Amino acid sequence: MATKAQNNETRKVNKLRYAEYYGQQPILDGLYADSKDGRIFKNLMPLILSQKNILQAYRTMKGNKGSHTPGTDALTIENIEAMEAKALCTEVKRRLGNYQPSPVRRKEIPKPNGKTRPLGIPCIWDRLIQQCILQILEPICEAKFSAVSYTHLTLPTILL
């Protein structure tokens, strides 16, 4: 059984691999460098809505165990994986046009001490849209964090 650290490492490597596969890595590296140089970003929507970014977000999300867990709309990754790439991108763009997140499904998760903790499970489309946004904002934000703090960094940043 893989440890939590091994799972995190696998996730980081997959993230880098997916970015390279979809041709996003030069874009993400550019965002990081521009942010590091103090650039102010005004219109990121074209990057967020790009087909490459949407497909990378879908691939990243598809690899998560949680993608098989339904949100309040009862949909899972299986409901959207039959869509062709163009249709998937069109639907994400349509939903992002006037984006309002759906309510999350609440689930109580048992803790070892007998108590529970609340877990919010978003709808599959919200997860996909939020992943699209995260992929573009993450390198911009990472460039702003302290150079001596490594707890928040992802593998591509550490390797720079």
Residue ranges and their predicted role:
Residues 79-101:
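Amphipathic alpha-helical blocks
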Residues 116-145:
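Conserved pre-motif C helix in the palm subdomain of viral-like polymerases
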Residues 1-86:
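Non-catalytic, polymerase-adjacent accessory regions of viral genome-replication enzymes
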Residues 106, 143-148:
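A short alpha-helix capping/helix-loop junction motif
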Residues 110-113:
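Residues forming anionic-ligand binding surfaces in small-molecule and nucleic-acid pockets
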Residues 77, 102, 107:
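Extended, charge-enriched "interface" segments that sit outside catalytic cores
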Residues 151-157:
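Conserved small/polar residues in nucleotide/adenosyl-binding loops
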